[in-house]
Each structure stands twice: as C-alpha cells, then as structure tokens.
Amino acid sequence: MKKYDRGWASLETGAALLIVMLLIAWGAGIWQDYIQTKGWQTEARLVSNWTSAARSYIGKNYTTLQGSSTTTTPAVITTTMLKNTGFLSSGFTETNSEGQRLQAYVVRNAQNPELLQAMVVSSGGTPYPVKALIQMAKDITTGLGGYIQDGKTATGALRSWSVALSNYGAKSGNGHIAVLLSTDELSGAAEDTDRLYRFQVNGRPDLNKMHTAIDMGSNNLNNVGAVNAQTGNFSGNVNGVNGTFSGQVKGNSGNFDVNVTAGGDIRSNNGWLITRNSKGWLNETHGGGFYMSDGSWVRSVNNKGIYTGGQVKGGTVRADGRLYTGEYLQLERTAVAGASCSPNGLVGRDNTGAILSCQSGTWKSSSASIWTNIKTFTLYPKNTQVLGRFKLCINTYRIDGREMAETEVVPIDMPDSNGEMIWQAKNYTQYSSYFMKITCLK
C-alpha cells in the first residue's frame, strides 16, 4: 500500500469501532429496559395477588367491615391480617422490592352506605419512577390499577380515573401504587362467598364449596364422577356395578343379580342362609360343601366325607357300604333272649352284654362257635416267629419256673371281620431243651 493511503485505512477502522461501540451501548440500554420491565411486571402480579386476597377477605367479612367503617373512616386491612386468615400464604413478604407496604382502605359508599368500596395503596419505602408506575398500573389484573404522583390523588392507568386519597382515609406519597376496588367489585366478592361456582377458580376452593344442605326438589344428579359422603339415606333403589365399603353396610334387604364376595365372615344374627335351585354352601378351595337337590336329603358336594371329633346324631344312620369303627360298637338298649323282634338280622345285647341276634322273629343268643383248622408250631430258644392269622394261639408245652416268663405268644394287630388276628411267638430261654409247642386255632 502506498504511504499516502494509510490515513484512510486508519479512519475506516476507527469508524467501524465507533459504530460497534454505539450498537453495544444501544443494546445494553434495551436489555436494561427489558429487565426493568420484567421486574415491574412481576411487581404488578404481586400487587394483583395481594389485591385479590384483600377482595376475598372483604367478601368473606362484608358484614363485619360494614359495621367497622363509615363513609369517611376506613377499616384498614394489612398483610398480616391476610396471612393470619389464610388469604395470603405465610411466606408472603410484608413489603415489595422497593420497601413499600400495601394496605387496603375500606369505606362505605357515600351514595349508598349499604355498599362498600376500597382502595389498595402502597406507602413508605422508595418511590417508583413514573415510567414504572405507568407500566405497573396497566399490568395490574385485579381491580383498577393506578398510581400516585402528587401524594394526594390516585390516578388510573391511561388516566382512566382519578380519586382523592382522602375519600378513602388513605395516606401515601409520590411514586406509589394504588388499586381501586369499586362497589360492584366488592359486591361480587360478597356474592362469591354465597355462590356455588360451576367451574374451578384457581386459589379459591371456597367458591366450589357448599355451606348448607341442598334440596334438589326431586331432580337428578347426573354424570357424577365420584360421590364422597359420611352417610347416605335412600328411600328407593341404589344401582351400581361395584362397591367398596371400609365399614358396615346396613339395610332391610339386599338383592344381587350375580355374586357377593366377602374378604371376611358373613354373619346372620337371627336369620337363615337361604339358597335356591339345588344350590347350597360350597368351599371353593377344596370342592366340598352341602346342598339339596330334592325334598328329603341334605347332600355332600362331590360326595365328600364328613369329619368331626364330636358326635353325629340322627333318628337312623344308614351306611350303603361297610360300617367301620376305630374303637368299639356300643349297644345301649338291651334285649331279652326269646322275646319277639323284627326284622330278622337285628343285632342286640342282653343285660350281661352277651350278643343277641333276631332270628325268625325271636331274639336268640349267639351259639358258641367251633374252632377248627388247628395248626401247631415248634419254636426253639432265642427265636421269634410270626405265626399267621388265627383267632387264638397258645403255648401248649410246659416250661417250668423262670423260663415260662421268658416266652410270649401275643397278637400284633386288631381283629378282622372274622375275629382273626396276626399272632407272634418269642422264645428267650437259654437252653435248647426248652422249646415251645404252640397251637393256633381258627
């Protein structure tokens, strides 16, 4: 580059740097304005929340505030009062970012003293610039947003209204916030406490709550998702698919088209468990139970057995198969041999316990049976032998003295239907000449 062109290059570079610096300064100003605006919008939301809480408080305590205020003397509502009554959360600060404190001044309307009107005013702290006041007044969503410029008058956003602070008994200074709550606004707040809202209002669950009984005038409640109640009285039918009860279900009667399932016991104090159509009681786990399929018999489901450690009683007890007893057969009534009886085949006993049987219409004593099929065994010392099934086995060989006590012939099971048992013999004697001679009879 020629030396005489170097001055122009330096000038161009300096101009470019100057433009960049101007753009940075301009952008920084815009960014700062944006941050300030967002901060003022946040302040406006906080004021709106506070005003909404004050509005609800007035609506809830409308009658009380009427009694404590006049057209010139206000009833004053503070942040502490709103927090203590639950209209503001306990974490809500007493002052805003500039140290200003909000209060609501409630007075009676001069034209209609039965109605209330109010103004929310901030006081103390550092004043806001006019730009901030104008911005916040437009962004306040509850009531009519405004601000105070001269310390005496509250002016609405876009200068839409102007009211002297003295009309509300309020005091403040320049650079502070004001919100007007008209008589219509507060009348609506009072009605809010008595009106049941069809839709949910965020932060106002009380608007969807009944405070007294409701009479539907014999009309219906349709398309109900869930009904939660402490008690219920119905003069007609209650129809449904499923029902869950943690306590008791009481009624004069109940009809179920399908099943009833209980996790615990089913009790009847003075009634019956009644079934129909050949049904009865069934244990689902083991497949047993009782039912009736005719007018005469109570039957066991699936021919299950009946087991009890107590007694089974009846006018008669019939076994189509064998009749077994694990102990003895006890006949309580007595018969007399030679007396008449019916039918043949009855078994009884006399007063001595001897067995009688009904034969040809007469009680007869059982004749002594003749034992036959005699079999003998020889058992030498130091041996044991199972002899077989007999009615009786005896040692017929004489062994004198001590050796007699060292032999044994005994049954080792219970008698069968023929009175026969398995017999066993033992010979514990020491000498080979002391063998046993055993005779068994059938």
From Swiss-Prot:
Pfam families per UniProt: Shufflon_N
Start and end residues of each stretch annotated as Variable region: 362-442
Keywords, ordered alphabetically: Plasmid
InterPro entries per the UniProt record, alphabetical: Enolase-like_N, Shufflon_N
Region listing for Constant region, in residue ranges: 1-361
Domain of life: Bacteria
Further comment: This protein is expressed by a shufflon (= clustered inversion region that works as a biological switch). The orfs of this region share a constant N-terminus, while the C-terminus is variable.
Name of the protein in question: Shufflon protein B
Provenance organism: Escherichia coli
